[in-house]
Amino acid sequence: MKINQLPAPVLTHGLVPLAHRLIQLHLFLTRTEVMNEIGITSRLDQGEKGIAVLWHQRLYGAISYAKNATKYQPSAIISRSHDGDLISALVHRFHFRPIRGSSSQGGKEALSAIVNDLKANPLAIHAADGPRGPRGVVKAGLIR
């Protein structure tokens, strides 16, 4: 059985909480070093805005920084797909604010929403390459 064939309650009330706990355990057992973290956080604390940009294949590594970013409650663009439903529920548990959209569904609205969100909040997160690739190539939209 594929994961997307499981009933929604099993996923949202079973798999997502389990994944959250496993990631918390992983974060507890590992050490993360962020280069120039004080420079970044001091600017955010002074009211400056920031967009953390990363590659799709590095998303899990970015979660390790989640515990340091929770006070900023960053917004993150997440696909409107079934997988995006799970990811959205998971990042919400880390105090990220999901904004749903992608290059194929609701991307324009998501980009507009994240720009508006940055007016009220200091930090947003976005994967610069689309989930369909090519990997490591910045897609149009984030930077105009």
Language model regions located:
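Membrane-anchoring hydrophobic helices of lipid-metabolizing enzymes
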Residues: 1-65
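Short amphipathic alpha-helical segments and helix-helix/interface helices
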Residues: 40-41, 88, 142-143
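Short acidic/histidine-rich motifs immediately flanking catalytic phosphotransfer sites
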Residues: 48, 120-122
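Catalytic core of membrane glycerolipid acyltransferases/transacylases, capturing the structured
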Residues: 49-105
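Acidic, metal-coordinating catalytic cores used for nucleic-acid/nucleotide bond scission
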Residues: 82, 104-107, 131-138
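Structural motif
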Residues: 107-113
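Membrane-associated lipid acylation/remodeling enzymes share a hydrophobic transmembrane-juxtamembrane segment
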Residues: 122-144
